[in-house]
């Protein structure tokens, strides 16, 4: 069995991620060359913005924060946190010139400028992972895919008034049963959701929780699994608010910080993680852009039918454009050796930071999408959200990889 969790947009850490990425969107929309490292802290009645920004853009950060908090759903002081009454403190510095010099002029370009993609160095050292598997149509692990679906539906029924007693904070967790490496059933579903103290005339705590349990099954679980081949059955455990009432939540219940939900943001623990968060960072930061590129590589390999599972590691040195290493691992599911897959990757994927920026248009996308891009992936996962038309989710190189692998295999058999 394997478990993964997700959180709703009203979770304290996710509030921070969304504000951080709303800042990235606003700055890149006005100035695509902005350098951003925006960190956010939330607590009862407080939002603190800090980090480093170098940009020509002029942004009203206080208004941005209030608008995002209101969009999430914190518009009533009864929720313990309110968009219009919370204090907003802004404490940004400029990016260090020592860091900027390595990004502006990579090691490879000093003395030579033959290739424009050698001009931009990695913004930091680090290692990033990308992953894909054939458990879902979007080529994501099933546990995290289901957890995100439940969290998204939980927010939907709150916002559209289906369950008006729900409040913004919430978490989900799904445990999937596997046999011989393939998902076969749902072992446990867990939903914890913030709610009002009473539901209409229902005031007794046990009765409130009983109503919540019934409503969540009908309005959240049932729609999520309606068209999926694997469904909960009579053996599935269904847990809701296991500690009892969940009235105090959001920043009133727990402080939140940007970058504390990196497993929720990626593959739910199913794949390794390099440790770097995504939100609040402009795409010159390889923590973000290279993780997107590694997902793109892994997804195209799986989409090509060359493996059932694929994990790609890439690492960088600060100020150096070319990756230090690339690793391809298919966990014994590859149709061709991992070493040959690595050669395909090296031939067909340019993982230098500037090449990633150019191919995915990571600096231009916020402006192209009307000022909203990164904040949309700051909740419910940076991967697998195919409805958002994310460039790293495309499988436009799958056919090429498949054809070249087939040609290689045919040549070996000739």
From Swiss-Prot:
The GO terms describing molecular function are: ATP binding; magnesium ion binding; methionine adenosyltransferase activity
The record's comment on cofactor binding reads: Binds 2 divalent ions per subunit.
Q: Where does the record place it?
A: Cytoplasm
Instruction: Name any cofactors this protein relies on.
Output: Mg(2+); K(+)
Uppermost EC category: transferase
Q: Which GO terms describe its biological process?
A: one-carbon metabolic process; S-adenosylmethionine biosynthetic process
Q: Which residues bind L-methionine?
A: 52, 95, 254, 285
Summarize where Mg(2+) binds, as residue positions.
13
Give the record's GO CC terms.
Answer: cytoplasm
- One of its Pfam families is S-AdoMet_synt_N
Q: Where, by residue number, does ATP bind?
A: 11, 169-171, 245-246, 254, 260-261, 277, 281
Recorded catalytic reaction(s): these are: L-methionine + ATP + H2O = S-adenosyl-L-methionine + phosphate + diphosphate
The segment annotated Flexible loop runs over 95-105
List positions binding K(+): 39
Among InterPro entries, the record links this protein to: ADOMET_SYNTHASE_CS, S-AdoMet_synt_C, S-AdoMet_synt_central, S-AdoMet_synt_N, S-AdoMet_synthetase, S-AdoMet_synthetase_sfam
Task: Tell me which PROSITE patterns the record gives.
Answer: ADOMET_SYNTHASE_1 (PS00376), ADOMET_SYNTHASE_2 (PS00377)
Q: Which superkingdom heads the taxonomic lineage of this protein's source?
A: Bacteria
Q: Which keywords belong to this entry? A: ATP-binding, Cytoplasm, Magnesium, Metal-binding, Nucleotide-binding, One-carbon metabolism, Potassium, Transferase
What family does the database annotate? Belongs to the AdoMet synthase family.
Q: Which HAMAP family match?
A: S_AdoMet_synth1
Give the protein's function: Catalyzes the formation of S-adenosylmethionine (AdoMet) from methionine and ATP. The overall synthetic reaction is composed of two sequential steps, AdoMet formation and the subsequent tripolyphosphate hydrolysis which occurs prior to release of AdoMet from the enzyme.
- Summarize the subunit comment: Homotetramer; dimer of dimers.
**Identification of the protein by name:** S-adenosylmethionine synthase
Instruction: State the organism of origin.
Output: Synechococcus sp. (strain JA-2-3B'a(2-13)) (Cyanobacteria bacterium Yellowstone B-Prime)
Encoding gene, per UniProt annotation: metK
């Amino acid at each position: 069995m394997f478990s993964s969790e997700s959180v709703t947009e009203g979770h304290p850490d996710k509030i921070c991620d969304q504000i951080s990425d709303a800042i990235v969107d606003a700055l890149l929309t006005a100035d695509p060359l902005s350098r951003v490292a925006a960190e956010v802290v939330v607590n009862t009645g407080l939002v603190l913005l800090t980090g480093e920004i170098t940009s020509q853009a002029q942004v009203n950060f206080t208004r941005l924060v209030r608008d995002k908090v209101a969009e999430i759903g914190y518009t009533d002081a009864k929720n313990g946190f309110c968009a219009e009454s919370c204090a907003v403190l802004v404490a940004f510095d400029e990016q260090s010139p020592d860091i900027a010099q390595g990004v502006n002029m990579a090691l490879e370009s000093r003395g030579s400028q033959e290739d424009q993609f050698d001009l931009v160095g990695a913004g930091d050292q680090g290692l990033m992972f990308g992953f894909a598997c054939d458990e879902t149509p979007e080529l994501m692990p099933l546990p995290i895919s289901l957890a995100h679906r439940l969290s998204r539906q939980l927010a939907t029924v709150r916002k559209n008034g289906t369950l008006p007693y729900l409040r913004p904070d919430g978490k989900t967790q799904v445990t999937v049963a596997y046999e011989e490496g393939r998902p076969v059933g749902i072992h446990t579903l867990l939903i914890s959701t913030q709610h009002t103290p009473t539901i209409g005339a229902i005031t007794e705590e046990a009765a409130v929780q009983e109503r919540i349990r019934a409503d969540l099954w009908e309005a959240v679980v049932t729609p999520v699994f309606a068209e999926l081949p694997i469904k909960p059955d009579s053996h599935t455990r269904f847990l809701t608010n296991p500690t009892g009432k969940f009235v105090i939540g959001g920043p009133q219940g727990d402080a939140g910080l940007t970058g504390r939900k990196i497993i929720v943001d990626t593959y739910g623990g199913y794949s390794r993680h390099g440790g770097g968060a995504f939100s609040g960072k402009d795409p010159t930061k390889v923590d973000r852009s290279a993780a997107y590129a590694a997902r793109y590589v892994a997804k195209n390999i799986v989409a090509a039918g060359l493996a059932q599972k694929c994990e790609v590691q890439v690492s960088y040195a600060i100020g150096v454009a070319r990756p230090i290493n690339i690793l391809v691992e298919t966990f014994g599911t590859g149709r061709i050796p991992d070493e040959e897959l690595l050669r395909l990757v090296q031939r067909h994927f340019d993982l230098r930071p500037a090449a990633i920026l150019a191919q995915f248009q990571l600096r231009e996308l916020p402006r192209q999408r009307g000022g909203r891009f990164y904040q949309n992936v700051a909740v419910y996962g940076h991967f697998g959200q195919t409805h958002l038309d994310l460039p790293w989710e495309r499988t436009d190189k799958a056919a090429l990889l498949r054809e070249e692998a087939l040609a290689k295999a045919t040549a070996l058999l000739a």
